[in-house]
Structure formats: C-alpha cells, structure tokens
C-alpha cells in the first residue's frame, strides 16, 4: 500500500534537517511516514554523501576571529567554491563552530568534532551540511590564544589575524592585527628571524648579484643592503605602520608603552593546491563525447 505524505510532514522535515523538498519527501516515503526514522535515514545518507565528497579539494571558505575576555580564537573553515563561501547556511555553521570552540577553549579539530551541536555533534552537523549544500566542507584549523590585550581583525572573510599584546589598549591591539593582515610580517622582531632563514636568503641574494655580473666586492655590498631590507620586510616592528607609514610599528608600540608578544595570521586556502578548471576543455570534451 502506497504511503501518502502530506505537505505538513515535508515542511516539518525540511525545518528540522534543512534538506531539499524532494529529498524530504523521498525520505518520508521510504520511512513510511515515520518522521524520526526519516531523519535518521537522512543523517545516514548525509554521512555517506559527505564521505564521498571528502576527497574533493576544499580551498575556498572563511576565516573567523573571535575574542572573549582574555581568550581569542582564529579558525578556518573550507568549502569548494567561493559561491558556497557566501552561503548563509555555511556561514552560520562556521560561526557556530567558532563559538563552540572558543567557549570550550578547543584548538583541535578532532576534539571540536566531538562537541555538542544542536543535539548532535559538530561532525554530524558538518556531514548534514555537506549533504544539503553538495560540497565538501572541512574545519581546517583552529588556534586558541590567551593574553592580556588581544586584538582581532578579519578582512573580507579571507584573511584573519589575532594579535597578543602586553600593554596598550583595545584600539592598539586591533590596529596591530589590521597591520599584520595587510603587511603579512612573518616574525615580531628582526632578531626573531631564524639564522637558517637569513642564511638562505643571503645565498639567494648573492647568487642574484653575481649573476648580474657585478664584481665580488660590489656584490657583497649589494647583498648587505638587501639583507637589511629583508629583515625589515619580514619583521613586524621594523615595518612602516600601515595607517601612518611615516612611523615604524616599533615606535607606535614604544609610544604606547606596549609590546607585541605574538600574532597569528591565517589566509583562506593558503598551502592548498587548488584545482584549476579549464571549462572550455570540459565543454569540448562533453560535446565530443555526445557526438559519438
């Protein structure tokens, strides 16, 4: 006997799962109208869909930065396309897991996945969202930091920074975070640059100078100048302050009686090999296949 599924049942299932209308109707028919069984089955199928999509490259997404008192969080949540990175459901999930991680001071993705999320776990919520949206979604990395004066800045959801200062005020820590986002220093001070990094850069600069045909003595002087510039470029305190290039960050901090202890800077997709789609070739291949 065929099971009749009402519009009210479909709506209730949609409200509870956020899945598509046809998926809800199909699940209710298969569960013979049992709402709870339909939800259970959809979660199972959602997990299967999520597993199938797990191997796909997720290099787009959003960076989130949150500060609560003396604790701050910086996180990256990835998806496959920039379109989904702007999706309300994706952003709601990303913001909620950031709040959960901050509240529990969790900096491990594995530990976060086990925490509660609307009656389920974060991992189940992620799998359900993969099923709904149709893209691989991953919580890539989390950082929890504690400090006296924490600053947070996110630029267009793509670059995020947490700055940790001793002294100064909230405006200063935010300005430092904003500067780090824009100037991308790698170290706090010039003396923090590791010796092997300096040696490698010197080797590169010397090779460039020699290749240009300069005499060795002149090449050495050129390299010395370039190395001084290199240390200034990669260290925060040696950089011109982004909001007032007439002063260095070091002077800004000194005048405020403050010190930068550390900073963390994340950029969406950094270090991930993105697949470059050749849509023209894809269309040509599809047309060639259909012509056979």
UniProtKB/Swiss-Prot annotation:
Listed name of the protein: Elongation factor Ts
Family label: Belongs to the EF-Ts family.
Main location as per UniProt: cytoplasm
InterPro entries: EF-Ts_dimer_sf (IPR036402), Transl_elong_EFTs/EF1B (IPR001816), Transl_elong_EFTs/EF1B_dimer (IPR014039), UBA-like_sf (IPR009060)
GO cellular component: cytoplasm
Pfam annotation, one family: EF_TS
Record function comment: Associates with the EF-Tu.GDP complex and induces the exchange of GDP to GTP. It remains bound to the aminoacyl-tRNA.EF-Tu.GTP complex up to the GTP hydrolysis stage on the ribosome.
Record localization: Cytoplasm
Domain of life: Bacteria
């Amino acid at each position: 006997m065929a099971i009749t599924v009402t519009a009210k049942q479909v709506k209730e299932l949609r409200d509870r799962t956020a899945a598509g209308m046809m998926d809800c109707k199909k699940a209710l028919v298969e569960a013979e109208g049992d709402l709870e069984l339909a939800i259970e089955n959809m979660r199972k199928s959602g997990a299967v869909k999520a597993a199938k999509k797990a191997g796909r490259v997720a290099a787009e997404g959003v960076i989130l930065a949150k500060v609560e008192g003396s604790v701050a969080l910086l996180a990256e949540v990835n998806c496959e396309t920039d379109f989904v990175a702007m999706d309300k459901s994706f952003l709601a999930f990303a913001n909620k897991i950031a709040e959960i991680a901050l509240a529990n001071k969790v900096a491990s993705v594995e530990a976060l996945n086990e925490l509660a999320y609307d009656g389920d776990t974060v991992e189940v919520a992620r799998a359900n969202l993969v099923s709904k949206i149709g893209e691989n979604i991953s919580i890539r990395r989390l950082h929890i930091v504690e400090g006296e004066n924490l600053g947070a800045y996110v630029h267009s959801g793509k670059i995020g920074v947490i700055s940790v200062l001793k002294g100064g005020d909230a405006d200063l820590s935010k300005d430092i975070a904003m500067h780090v986002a824009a100037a991308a220093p790698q170290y706090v001070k010039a003396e923090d640059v590791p010796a092997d990094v300096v040696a490698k850069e010197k080797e590169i600069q010397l090779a460039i100078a020699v290749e240009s045909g300069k005499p060795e003595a002149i090449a050495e002087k050129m390299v010395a100048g370039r190395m001084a510039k290199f240390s200034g470029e990669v260290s925060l305190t040696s950089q011109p302050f982004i909001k007032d290039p007439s002063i260095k960050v070091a002077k800004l901090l000194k005048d405020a009686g403050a010190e930068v202890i550390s900073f963390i800077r994340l950029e969406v997709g950094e270090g991930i090999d993105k697949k470059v789609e050749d849509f023209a070739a894809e269309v040509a291949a599809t047309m060639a296949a259909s012509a056979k």
